[in-house]
């Protein structure tokens, strides 16, 4: 049994508890105005300041990202080197001409081994990625980190160099979060 199946079985056990008549949810008051400010103020930023940013809380938040059956297939690679950021600025179609100016480029990948059913392999990785992207957007906004998502489009002739440099594990690339200061 792999780690994804173990996570799935834990998810099933939690779900069973929640369906029990004795289960009582522990909800907080969702009328908190700060929460709604984060929702309303979230934006995609493509121009960054030169201040340093602290991303440890953003990185730590990744463990809380929901995913299908709680398998947590998301992996990330964080790049802050000028040469690699410049290279990514040429490889990632949606980032041409601007992403190299950000403090960090967070490449997002999913491990296809997490998906057991053939029926879910074509679309579920992208649904999980979408949920992860929104989670990272909202967390970045709450932490006052400028952020923008870049779609996973890489020209066919550039895929080999991208994979050799940034995807040695052969995971499915699902996009990048570009992070910097306001």
What are the functions of these language-model segments?
Residues 1-104:
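N-terminal amphipathic, basic helical "cap/leader" segment at the start of enzyme domains
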Residues 62, 106, 119-162:
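Small-aliphatic-rich amphipathic alpha-helix that forms the alpha element of a beta-alpha
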Residues 72, 145-149, 173:
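A short coil-to-beta-strand element that immediately follows conserved catalytic motifs
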Residues 75, 153, 179:
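Residue-level "edge-of-site" marker
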Residues 82, 112-113, 153-157:
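Acidic, glycine-rich active-site loops and adjacent beta-strand->loop/helix elements
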Residues 94-125:
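Helix-adjacent hinge/juxtasegments
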Residues 96-105, 163-182:
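A glycine-rich helix N-cap at a beta->alpha junction
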Residues 110, 152, 181:
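Short secondary-structure boundary segments
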